[in-house]
Structures are given as structure tokens and as C-alpha cells.
Amino acid sequence: MKNRVFIFLLASSGLLASCNFLEVDKYFDEQLTLEKVFSSKTYTEQWLRNTYSYMNYVVDVSSREGTIENFADDLCFNDFGETSILGDAEEYGTFLTVAYDESYRQTTWTYCWQGINKACTFLQHIDSNVAYSDADRADLKAQARFVRAYYYWALLKKYGPIPLLPEEGPDYGLSYDELSIPRRPYWECADYIADEFAKAAVDLPLKRDGTNIARPTRGAALGYRAKVLLYAASPLMNGNNDSYAARLVDDQGNRLISAEYDERRWALAAAAALDVMDLNVYELVHSPVRTVSMGRKYPKTVKPFADGEFSTMNWPDGYADIDPFESYRSVFNGSESASTNSELLFTRGKNGNNGWDASEQYDKNFSIEKMVADLLPKSAQGRNRISMTQKQCDAYYMYDGKDVPGKDSEIGGGDGSVRPGIISDSEASDLSFAPALGEDASVRKGISKQYANREPRFYASVAYNGRVWGRGSEVYTESKPITYYQSWYYRNSDNGKKNGYEFPLTGIGFMKYVHPDDSQQGDASAIVAKVEPALRYADILLCYAEALNELQTSYTVPSYDGRKMHQLSRSQDELERGVHPVRIRAGLPDWPDAAYENRDLFREKLKRERQIEFVGECQRYYDLRRWKDAEKEYTKPIYGCNMNIPLSGSSETEKEKYRILFHTPVEVPNVPAVFVDKSYFWPFSKTELKRNKRLTQNPGWNIYD
């Protein structure tokens, strides 16, 4: 095997060094034996670099072209009437209705297996390279093991149970029939991947310096291990007796999803999350109180609700000394670099390129900057195409932790309250009213009261009708003395339903990744580079709380390295340990004791917390499936503002009527509310099924016998 000649693609632009090391720019082909590759430090590290490079195509945060799963029941994408760069006409609707075929979007499958094969080869041969010290060699092996486990995890999450290669990788001297291997049960896949992450964690460092920030650390390996085990404990994979699970079998007819519920799996997930927490390396990003306004881009801190508890204490026990709005938005908008973001367990560094152009290469579609270009308003030369559903908008709390009046009233939920009206002139002039909407009365007038007095994460994420955009990178001149931009979505307005498909379908925009300087207008415009939040500490904290909530007895579980034993049981103190940091950073009061005392109520609240905290991070798509909530949530009609309503009328009284009509939720046309159970897992392509004779198709998809 070692003397077999391989085509080794070598990067001509340096080694694995910087935070954007995943950009493999130019290659040349050279015939090299594996013996020669792994006797050279240069070639060895370039092999590892190439192993990493496939991560560029397996991202969680990007727009429609890169990660269409980022659009679940929380976000919508307007491409109706358009043919995408990928050649798919009106692709969003096709995705929603699961009208695609088995060849659709197989990028994850293709690149993950290439990465797995590369990692297997690296692990088989790195020990022969005597140019490294034992410590450096152990780190490199741990990196390769992490990357291989990551690719396996990406496949398992998307495709469900998968084949697992032998440790040494495939023997390419065998025929296709001899190489064919069956799918392994979900729990076996999860246990194997979790074990691989644990092995990697032992030899990975706690931290990396700034030049190696996108290489994995111990926390990254342990964090993904916790995610893997949490999914394995979830209802779709644990004790699932429905017809879908019964049809998901290997080539011998054996079930691939367990019909027997195992509570201990929740304990394993909780212990894995606790392994991360016990590192004492991570904490949620938090910004100090801003006592003086620095303009519309950086407003004075809006004091959170005085709950008598969190409001009286400083971070991390309370929010008296932090700015929750700035704390949350800086995680995503580029204000924090990969090296300063204290809650990032893993990132690929700067995901994508600064700016986006349709003529540029396809891989730039796998970037946050592409997403920002799609959600910026037309007035900033954005594409204005990403919107938030009314259901997602309603999920955000009021600043005091209560529900917004009228929440979910159109989809059979809520408490019978009605949605509030429009902010009047007198209310807009009252500086104590809805300060988070803007410090000047001029920008508060005419905004719906349903957007007033909401929690800080709302203002960091929601581009409601009348929202102010910073656009600070633009150059202002005497002929262009504009100091802010307020975007309205009324029909025929610049950012509303006017022409083509460049308007938000629901009339509720999304701006979680937008920096106050972001704009594509003018020569000096720019989109601030973003750091991909691939895995955050907030996720680990809520994973811990979710898993712990499901325990009905006590468990003793060893840590990842066997050096300590975790004693696990459901208790309010431990549940608060997972929930409190997220709620405090959000500037929200604690849940009532009843939520901690009642397992079902806690589960309901935790699901809502995840819905809010991780919107636009490709979590909702998978969360709804693993919880088996997808059918319930996807079949609720999608509501939003009435985009057919213009702001008409010659008097304020007449305009008021149109404002109310616009903000009265209606069902969004062309966005079907449907769930098809075959979309629990992605299909295998016809090519792959023919290549691997023992690979069985996921239920509901063509098997191509």
C-alpha cells in the first residue's frame, strides 16, 4: 500500500498556518509515493491541509446556495421566479416540498468521504515521519482524527446511519463488490464518532494561538462529542417505534434506529457536555454597559428588566454590568475575531470572502458574507431576500420575559390577546417608550408596537419594518448627507414588493450577521469579515440542560479520559447551570420555579430557547427532526406581514389604516406548509447506491433496484 503511487495535490501557497488556512488556492500535480510524502514535513503538512480543505464545503452558516437547510420554519428565502447560480429554478420551494430527487445537493457526501479517506491515510502513515517530535506528531494525529470524526458526524447528522470504514481506510486494490460495506446502526455510528472525538481530545491543546485559531482544540473535540451523543439520545434515534424507523434498515433487514428507549444515552450526553464545561476555558461573549450613545450604530445600553435578581448582580451572576444587545450581536457580526470570541469552540476562521459577486467561483456560496449580501436591503445594494417567519418573530420574549401580545394567534396558539397597534406621534416622542427601537423619535414613529419592548436578541436579529441599518462603511458627502437608513417594506417602497424577487417574503427581515458598517453601496462599501460560529459554548450549556432534564434516576459516567466520574441527576441547580448564562447574556429574567420542577414544561421552554438563540445557525432544521417535532411545526402555515399593502393615504389617519393592514399577519403565498417524512434524512444518490451494493436507501426515496 505504501508504495502505491498517488496523485497528491499540493498547495503552492504556504502551509497550514493562518486562521483562513482552509483556502486551498492553487494546486499542481506531482507524482509522489506515500513513503516520500510522509518522510517530508512539508508534504505531510500539505496532506493534512488538503484533508482540512473539504470543510469549506460542509458549513452550517451560509445562504441558500451553500446551506439550504439553514431555512427551516424560522427563515424564508425568496427565489420565486429566479434561476439560481446552481441552475435550480425556484429552488427554495422545491426544497420545502421535498420535490427534489436523489441527486440533489450531494456536496456533503462527496467532500466528507474525500476528507475521511485523506485522514485515514494520514493516520496510517504519520508515525513513519521521524522529522517530528513525539508531541508534535501526537498533535497532528489528533487533528487528523478530529477532522475524520467531524466528517463522519456531518454525514451522520444529514444522512442518518452510514457505513464506517476500517481504521486503515479502503483498500483500493479490491473490486467495488468487495469494497461494499453496509450501513451501521445509528447508535454504533454515534458511539464510534464520540470515541474518536474523545481520543482526539486527549492530545489536542486547550488553546491555539492566533495563527492557528482554526485548528481544533480539546474543547472543539469534546464539544462535538457532546453534540453527537445528544442527537443519539434524542427521540428520532432513541426508542423510535414509528413506521419511518421501522423502514430504516440495512441490507439484511436489521433496524438502524433503536426501538428500545435507553435513558442512559441522555446521561452520556450530559456528561459529555460537562466535560467541556469543566475545562473552564469558555464563557459567553459579554460586552460592558455603554453609558453614552455613540450614534445609531452603537446606542446607549438599554437597561434590561429589573427582575430583582439578575438585575442586581454583575456578570456572570447577573446582567447589571453588561449590554445584552451588544453582547449577543457581536458574536456574529464580525466585531469579535476568532481569537477574541470566548464562546467559540470551533470555527473555520473567516468563512468565505469579503464581499460576493455572482460571477465569482461557486465555493464563495459557502460563506457568511454571501448570506449577508442576501439579507441586506436594496438600499444598501443587498439582495433583500432572506426573511423571518411570524412564528420565529413571535418566539422572542418581551423585555420582561413575557410573551408578545397576539403570539401565534394565527396558527392556533397564544393566550387570546391581540396584536398591538402602531406607535403614534406622541408615543414616538416619549423617550422612555421603546428605546431599543431607536434613540430618536423620528425613527420610532409608525413602527408596529409588536416590535417594541422586546428582548435584546430580537433587536440583534430582527429587521422589522422601519428598522434602521447602520451602513457605516459608506462615504458621506455634502451631496449625500445621509447618516442612517430606515428600511420600510411596504409595497412599492424601495425594499418592499416592487419588482422581481428581491424582497423579504414575510416583510420581516433578518440581520443577525449584519455589522453596523456593512453595505454594498458605493466604492468604499464593504461587508465586515465574519467568523463562522460553527460550535458555540451556548450550545453546550443548553445541551447539558436538555440532556439532564430527561434523567429520571441518577447515573455515574466517566469523563472522556477516564480520570474522573461524573455524578449526574436532574436537579434545579444543575439545570440552572446550563440555562442561566444564556438567559443572563440575553438580558432576560429567569424562568419560574415551575419550569424547573416540571420536566415537560422545561423541555418546552428549552426548545424555545434554542429556537431563539440559534436562529440562522442551521440548528433548527436538525433540532425539529431529532425531537420529532418537524411534522407538527412544518405543517403550520407560514405567516408574515401583508406585502401587498402600500403606505397610502393623504392623511395620517388614512396611513394609520394601511400600517395596521400591513402588520396584520397573513399567510405567505408560495411558501407551502408541508412535511414529508422522507426528509428526516437526506437521500443517497443513484450513483452511490450502484457503487456500494450493500448501501440501503433512506425510506421514501428511490432505491434504483
What are these regions (language model features)?
Residues 1-29:
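Bacterial Sec-dependent N-terminal signal peptides
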Residues 41, 45-49, 53-58, 63, ...:
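Conserved, well-structured interaction surfaces
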Residues 19-69, 292, 437, 449-452, ...:
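Membrane-proximal, proline-rich intrinsically disordered regions
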Residues 18-21, 112-115, 192-194, 277-278, ...:
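Long, intrinsically disordered, low-complexity segments
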Residues 172, 179-186, 236-271, 531-536, ...:
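Acidic, serine/threonine/proline-rich low-complexity intrinsically disordered regions
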Residues 348, 356-468:
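Segments forming glycine/polar-rich beta-alpha architectures that bind adenosine-containing cofactors
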Residues 156-157, 163, 228-240, 550-554:
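Short coil/turn linking the two alpha-helices of tandem helical-hairpin repeats
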